[in-house]
């Protein structure tokens, strides 16, 4: 029985902790296990108590108990975790490896060691990273594809995976795990003799190795393909596939037909990011008047909006996407949804939102729609840089009526720390406030750490494919406002990164 197994695993963890504690207390009644939040630099001076606590972590009995805890936690988490989240974490696990290698190659551990336990803001951290790149010492922050915002998102994935600490929003510090790959060299030494970083070390830092997809972001001054550009087509994806095309035009090239078909069906699979049919709770669809029109912008084959069309027959849903996608959309669904298409309750229109302003459309019932009731952008903005996203949003804003709503469906990534700016409970929280998913007083990270790491992995994947990223709620609010939209509501299920953000014209 599953509950019996879960309780057995829970008990095993407790017993193993007891075994570890006995070893520590046999040496000293007050001796504690090393904290993950406190770095342990091998080249530094330590108190006798710190040295003993660290050495006991390798004691045979302690190590065996620790291994049982890791095994039980892994078994427990895979048993209760939603299979989709587990798959995403494992399929994209290489992204975490790339980010660890980036952290090592960019000398972030050494920079943060000298910054101390208070940590360093990403603005200052990026400046020091660039100063340690021989060909980039005169480059200004933001002169290449790696910006402070990108750096913050990379390090937030690592903090969410417990490889760093985010002590305040966008301020990061080392922890016990990151300190393990410290070379022991000073930043000044690395500036003068970068080729000797691994000399006279235990080889741990050197073993981390090198990767290209994320490292290309830090190659400002080294790689002319990515220098001085923030265009989507300058993403590492373009280097990997040796193409100047953006991802979606590349997907439509002859020879990529199977990839294009797979992508369309894969977007239907992205329903798994949210609670089942959460799109129906993400907006007050029933409050819209009879005949209201929902435009699903860049909606692919309509994998999410078709749920709305089926549940709310008083609405008319129009999915807009590029011609190759739209032409295959209806046939992709088979006979099940034929009544929706035959009645005109759901239809498709070929449109590239970059090529022209949004123009009126004529429905099957003869009505001309000059502006819809709702524009929906689901998993769209995370595909584009902020500049390109602003172009999309500005065009929709120009087509909107005062009563038009914008609904954005995307992952909204909390910080890996508590945000004191949102801790004031004397006033109603802003819709853009960063939530804390952890219970009060819990040692869990506010974003639930490994329980939500899948979203932070996707964040870095978007960076590598599109020079884009997932956003915090504050970043989303600022982006929408810059294009003439004000956030009025954010809906998400407890502990889930997925959110539907509603905005109105301003």
Give the residues covered by each predicted segment.
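N-terminal auxiliary segments of SAM/dcSAM-dependent transferases
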Residues: 4-73, 80, 148-266
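Short, contiguous, pocket-lining structural segments
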Residues: 255, 259, 267-271, 296-300, ...
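A short secondary-structure junction signal
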Residues: 122-123, 184-185, 222-223, 275-279
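Conserved SAM-binding loop and adjacent beta-strand
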Residues: 98-100, 260-279
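Alpha-helical subdomain
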Residues: 1-152, 166-168, 287-506
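Short coil/turn segments at secondary-structure boundaries
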Residues: 89, 232-238, 275-280
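Preference for short coil/turn "hinge" residues that link or interrupt alpha-helices
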Residues: 93, 157, 278-281
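Conserved alpha-helix/loop element of class I SAM-dependent methyltransferases that forms part
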Residues: 269-293, 307
């Amino acid at each position: 029985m599953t509950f019996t197994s879960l309780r057995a695993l829970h008990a095993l963890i407790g017993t193993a902790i007891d075994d570890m504690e006995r070893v520590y207390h046999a040496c000293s009644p007050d001796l504690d296990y090393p904290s993950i939040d406190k770095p342990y630099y091998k080249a530094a001076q330590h108190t006798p108590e710190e040295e003993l606590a660290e050495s006991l972590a390798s004691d045979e009995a302690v190590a065996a108990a620790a291994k049982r805890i890791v095994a039980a936690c892994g078994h427990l988490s895979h048993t209760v975790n939603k299979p989709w989240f587990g798959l995403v974490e494992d399929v994209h696990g290489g992204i975490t490896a790339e980010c660890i290698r980036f952290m090592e190659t960019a000398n972030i551990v050494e920079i943060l060691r000298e910054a101390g336990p208070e940590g360093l803001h990403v603005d200052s951290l990026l400046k020091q990273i660039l100063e340690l790149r021989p060909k980039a010492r005169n480059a200004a922050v933001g002169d290449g594809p790696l910006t402070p915002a990108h750096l913050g998102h990379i390090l937030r994935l690592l903090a969410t995976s417990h490889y760093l600490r985010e002590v305040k929003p966008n301020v990061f510090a080392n922890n016990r795990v990151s300190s393990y790959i410290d070379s022991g060299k000073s930043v000044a030494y690395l500036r003068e003799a970068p080729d000797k970083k691994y000399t006279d070390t235990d080889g741990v830092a050197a073993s981390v190795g090198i990767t290209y997809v994320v490292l290309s972001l830090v190659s400002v001054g080294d790689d002319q393909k990515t220098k001085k550009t923030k265009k989507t087509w300058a993403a590492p994806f373009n280097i990997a596939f040796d193409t100047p095309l953006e991802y979606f035009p590349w997907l439509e090239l002859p020879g990529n037909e199977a990839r294009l078909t797979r992508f369309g069906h894969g977007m239907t699979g992205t329903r798994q990011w949210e609670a089942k049919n959460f799109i129906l709770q993400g907006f007050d669809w029933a409050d819209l008047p009879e005949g209201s029109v929902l435009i699903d912008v860049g909606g692919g084959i309509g994998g999410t909006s078709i749920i709305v069309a089926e549940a709310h027959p008083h609405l008319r849903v129009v999915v807009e996407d590029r011609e190759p996608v739209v032409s295959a959309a209806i046939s992709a669904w088979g006979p099940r949804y034929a009544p929706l298409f035959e009645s005109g309750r759901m239809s498709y229109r070929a449109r590239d939102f970059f090529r022209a302003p949004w123009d009126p459309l004529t429905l099957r019932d003869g009505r001309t729609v000059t502006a819809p009731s709702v524009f929906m952008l689901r998993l769209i903005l995370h595909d584009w840089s902020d500049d390109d996203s602003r172009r999309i949003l500005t065009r929709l804003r120009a087509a909107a009526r005062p009563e038009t709503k914008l609904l954005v469906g995307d992952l909204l990534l909390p910080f890996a720390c508590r945000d004191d700016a949102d801790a004031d409970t004397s006033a109603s929280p802003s819709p853009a406030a960063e939530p804390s998913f952890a219970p009060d007083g819990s040692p869990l990270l506010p974003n639930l750490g490994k329980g939500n790491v899948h979203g932070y992995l996707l964040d870095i994947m978007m960076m590598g494919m599109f020079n884009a990223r997932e956003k915090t709620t504050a970043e989303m609010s600022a982006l929408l406002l810059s294009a003439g939209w004000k956030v009025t509501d954010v809906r998400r299920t407890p502990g889930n990164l997925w959110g539907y953000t509603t905005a109105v014209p301003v």
